[in-house]
């Protein structure tokens, strides 16, 4: 049985230790996810506190660090606008930071039907009413 592959379009902020490990895991296990689960993860945007980089065709697991060096200055609001303008089905904003400022942007993603995945301790321990 040949099933279509479901693509998840990832927009990742925070590419320090946790973000680097995420890239490593996605790169190492990509073929497994495609073959066994018919899921592909395509990274379309990345950012850290200094730079951000987007590519409509996807960002290579092999040279993302080099691409980041040539990215534009990082800005949370502009990052969100670019993610929104991509207008892709199955878009996922991934927050690997410990930033309240980034966590405060989740509402914009969610209101625009963009999934949010986070390990942000500040966001996960904020006021329950907010969530």
List each model region and its residues.
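NAD(P)-binding Rossmann-fold cofactor-contacting core
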Residues: 31-72
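A structured beta-alpha segment of the ubiquitous adenosine-cofactor-binding alpha/beta core
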Residues: 65-102
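Extended hydrophobic secondary-structure segments that form protein cores and membrane-embedded regions
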Residues: 9-13, 42-49, 93-94
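Glycine-rich adenosine-cofactor-binding loop
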Residues: 6-27
